[in-house]
């Protein structure tokens, strides 16, 4: 089951129906990765910089907000609790403006990025980063978005 929690009303001023948008991106990503049959449980928090700052400080010891954080729980299996994704509308808006990225494309990118982290992908090493970026590019292309470089 996919659960979307809108924790900041700014999301509704950017996207007409944020829950449907998020569900569409996540479901299409799972399908593109050919793992949609597992039906994992994922919770997505559509939040703001305040929450992402708190989470980033608590879990990563980084005293600043960030665009997306992922909290994996279980490895992928049938109806597993895959984990949580939190995404900040404030950082997304700022980055979209700063890097001239369409905001919906950037939101989709960060959702895909967060999902890949839940699935165990990382970008700490160059070879891992290449694999993760290629997957992001493929998934975003399947959604009709070009990969935006940040």
Swiss-Prot record:
<dbReference type="GO" id="GO:0004521">
    <property type="term" value="F:RNA endonuclease activity"/>
</dbReference>
<keyword id="KW-0540">Nuclease</keyword>
<feature type="binding site">
    <location>
        <position position="123"/>
    </location>
    <ligand>
        <name>Zn(2+)</name>
    </ligand>
</feature>
<keyword id="KW-0698">rRNA processing</keyword>
<dbReference type="InterPro" id="IPR023091">
    <property type="entry name" value="MetalPrtase_cat_dom_sf_prd"/>
</dbReference>
<keyword id="KW-0479">Metal-binding</keyword>
<keyword id="KW-0963">Cytoplasm</keyword>
<keyword id="KW-0255">Endonuclease</keyword>
<dbReference type="InterPro" id="IPR002036">
    <property type="entry name" value="YbeY"/>
</dbReference>
<keyword id="KW-0690">Ribosome biogenesis</keyword>
<dbReference type="GO" id="GO:0008270">
    <property type="term" value="F:zinc ion binding"/>
</dbReference>
<dbReference type="Pfam" id="PF02130">
    <property type="entry name" value="YbeY"/>
</dbReference>
<dbReference type="InterPro" id="IPR020549">
    <property type="entry name" value="YbeY_CS"/>
</dbReference>
<dbReference type="GO" id="GO:0006364">
    <property type="term" value="P:rRNA processing"/>
</dbReference>
<dbReference type="GO" id="GO:0004222">
    <property type="term" value="F:metalloendopeptidase activity"/>
</dbReference>
<comment type="function">
    <text>Single strand-specific metallo-endoribonuclease involved in late-stage 70S ribosome quality control and in maturation of the 3' terminus of the 16S rRNA.</text>
</comment>
<feature type="binding site">
    <location>
        <position position="117"/>
    </location>
    <ligand>
        <name>Zn(2+)</name>
    </ligand>
</feature>
<dbReference type="GO" id="GO:0005737">
    <property type="term" value="C:cytoplasm"/>
</dbReference>
<keyword id="KW-0378">Hydrolase</keyword>
<comment type="similarity">
    <text>Belongs to the endoribonuclease YbeY family.</text>
</comment>
<feature type="binding site">
    <location>
        <position position="113"/>
    </location>
    <ligand>
        <name>Zn(2+)</name>
    </ligand>
</feature>
<protein>
    <recommendedName>
        <fullName>Endoribonuclease YbeY</fullName>
        <ecNumber>3.1.-.-</ecNumber>
    </recommendedName>
</protein>
<keyword id="KW-0862">Zinc</keyword>
